[in-house]
């Protein structure tokens, strides 16, 4: 009886401060608010990104994923972070880098922290809902959220955005 209750609570889409996924907000790379209420009935792939990382080339596949599935209800949200000391210092620098080098047009947040006491509320929410596997261990960690605002799975940095594993989960969820 205890195990089913633990499983039930782990799958609730609430953080330990009572916030649901759709209560969250973040500023985009230009300073405009992204309200997660706008992501209801969408599948969201949240990826902490960085400009100076060995995985930075994944931007290309994130853009491909976005172009392939956005019309079906996928949101790719890049969250630039300097938590691992591999990001530019200014939002405009990140925006220009992504547009010039990778032709990115999926949503990017402002530069945020993704771990520790200063982690953005998105990552605090993810940790409280999915445990430590939702906390990025490195750049390009991926968190997949279903249409109900619940985390489906997380994927380590080395998991390519166009991998069969991620594609399969996205297609099942759309």
Model-derived features: positions:
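Thiol-/selenol-based redox modules, centered on thioredoxin-like
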Residues: 124, 128-174
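Structural microenvironment flanking redox-active thiols in thiol-disulfide oxidoreductases
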Residues: 55-120
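Short pre-active-site segment immediately N-terminal to redox-active cysteine/selenocysteine motifs
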Residues: 42, 48-52, 80-83, 148
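Alpha/beta-hydrolase fold active-site loops
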Residues: 41-44, 74
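N-terminal "domain-start" segment that seeds a small globular fold
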Residues: 13-37, 57
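Bacterial N-terminal signal peptides
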Residues: 1-8
